[in-house]
Amino acid sequence: MKITKITSHVLGYDLPETLGYSQQYYKKRTSHIVEVETDEGVTGWGECFGPGNIAFANKGIVEKVIQPIVLGMQALDRDVIWHKVYNLMRDHGQKGMPLQALSGVDIALWDIAGKAANLPLYKMIGGAHRDKVEVYGYGMMLRPENINSLISRFKEESAEIKEMGFKALKMKVGVGPKDDIKLIEAVREGIGDSFRFMVDANHGYTTHDALYVGRAMEEFSPYWFEEPVAPEDLDGYRELRALLKVNISGGEAEFNRWGWRKLLESRGLDIAQPEVCALGGISEYLRVLALCHSHFTPVVNHVWGSAIAVAVNLHLLAAMPPLPGGLFPWEPMLEFDTTHNHFIDDLLTVSLDIKNQVKSNNGTVSLPNGPGLGVTPQRDFLNKFRIDS
């Protein structure tokens, strides 16, 4: 079964309201879906991490760099393809966009392999350790509002996400240390004393400010403090983990096994958050997962993007071995975007229906059971939302 064509579908639409995090505001949602075709008529689907103009840069890498390398190769030779592409791109970047582009292609090749074997992805990996996956909802995004408006909205929105049935929720911070503490307090007030919530700084702090905010948030008992400092600041991560009671999480901005080896050896993480659509795809994710578990670091995948990314992560989380195991093992969670997202709600021929499942199944969702990823994008949807710039 030979690869005959690779197509990047960059999708976009204007959001009904501005969203943001510590690094930027944005008014347009984008997604980068990868389609790999074969000479036997089997098509695979994948996704590349990277918003906005990053998606167009990655499209160029997928179609102009990776495609010429792999055309005519056997689609089932995933590991051969991964290393051939990586080795030829290594001199031009071992992290970032080359890996994001490779991720989408690799995911699509796993989808093809599952379809060829007539097995769902989680079976291809080795089987499901759980038949349902717990889900947390993220929202409480920043907007260009004054702090009083943000406080009011965060309190209200957090209560709404809890009411939707999610097992936990995640909020953004990034408007300044003192005001961020006010936002954290508002969310705790909105959800009550015992509901689990997490705080995501998107590497917006210096180590000093992260320590200030981290100590202040301990009063409100968040479950983790995500990306408190820049991903390059391994010493900062290690210092914060040693000095704070809250779990320190991160890793969405790390790539491949070699980057993850350094991150894990620094001992700066309580919880690892690999991003399969960025770090090198499923092939590399499985190697990174093994590294995390060899360091006894629990994993909660970072998830951002379309329903393709959601489906991939459902399979990966189902197939994730328990760490450390036991009668009542620690359970990973699926990260789910509760904000306006056509690319989750409307992309597929058959919706994953995450929100309704969460509401009716005590905060959990079932696994896709079709071959490969078990999901298929609507061709008309791809055509409707495709953008060229």
Question: Where are these predicted regions, by residue range?
Answer:
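Structured beta-strand/loop patches that form or line metal/cofactor-binding pockets in enzymes
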Residues: 1-40, 45, 49-52, 341, ...
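Conserved, mostly hydrophobic/aromatic
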Residues: 3, 41, 66, 105, ...
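Metal- or metallocofactor-binding catalytic centers and their adjacent structured scaffolds
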Residues: 37-116
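A cross-domain feature marking catalytic cores of carbohydrate-active enzymes
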Residues: 48, 137-139, 171-173, 199-203, ...
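Metal-dependent enolase-superfamily TIM-barrel catalytic cores that perform enediolate-based chemistry
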Residues: 126-244
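Extended hydrophobic packing segments that form well-structured cores
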Residues: 364-389
